[in-house]
Amino acid sequence: VIYSHHHWDHASGGAVFADTADFVGHANMLSHLEMPPNSTTLSDVIGQYAPVAALDANDNDRIERGEANGNISDSQFRAFDANGDDGLNGAEVARGPVSLVHPPNVTYENELEITLGGKRVRLEWLEEMNHSFDMSRITFPEESTMMVVDYITFGRLPFREMDYENGMFQEWMAAIRETEEAAKDFEYVTTGHGPLGNWENITEWRVYFELLHEAVAAGIAAGQSLEEMQSNVEIPEYEHWGGYSWLNENVLGMYHFLTD
């Protein structure tokens, strides 16, 4: 089992293969799966999982299943609930819904090549960047195929607030540009979300970020508030992409990248 990174929607459920399989991922995946300190409160949670933390309607620093119903799925609730007590504390929410992720028993630091079915599979670490610190780019040389997950997506805007709490936008862009060049050696590029493509689709993804950066930076320079920018910023070249309704959240993320 080869992991791109630790996020629940790409890494959950591997335990069914635990009797026979090795689990391969970057060494940083292990730290991502660690539980934050018990002292972590729901009010400490920012960014991607802040909406989950906000479900604490009775303000007891614990999210009961009844508070979560209708807001997150049952399977996602169970993925947050590391201790299985049918409630979510601050540490569980801050860590994310990764309780169903089987940890890797084979890890690497910079790059790794393995053989599956007589064919090479290469994993390359993309260094610490915004989406996660354990991201692997996976390539299949014989198939001329590169796989990139989450930090690049085709035909869809970046997910919601873009994990701005990690504060590593420039590192994210560096990984995108480096991948854009590397992808020119491959016929196919496949992503964790979206259609099959090639290096030109990575260019489209990069240009979106550049346009978003330019628009938000201009709004800041003009003295606009975040709310004004969320109302005013439009990127019509990408209106046909999926997730365009997330643009106001993308603006929020870029605003934090530029001001925090």
Segments from the language model and where they lie:
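Metallo-beta-lactamase
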Residues: 113, 120, 124-211
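Short loop segments at secondary-structure junctions
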Residues: 21, 28, 118, 141-144
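Alpha-helical scaffolding segments of alpha/beta enzyme cores, especially the outer helices
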Residues: 16-19, 174, 211-214
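Solvent-exposed loop/turn segments at secondary-structure junctions
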Residues: 6-11, 29-32, 94-95, 114, ...
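Divalent metal-coordination and catalytic microenvironments
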Residues: 5, 17, 23, 108, ...
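Short Pro/Gly-enriched beta-strand edge/turn motifs at strand-loop
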Residues: 93-96, 117-123
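Accessory terminal helices/loops
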Residues: 58-80, 84-96, 130, 180-186, ...
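Active-site HxH/HxHxD metal-binding segment of metal-dependent hydrolases
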Residues: 1-55, 62-113, 133
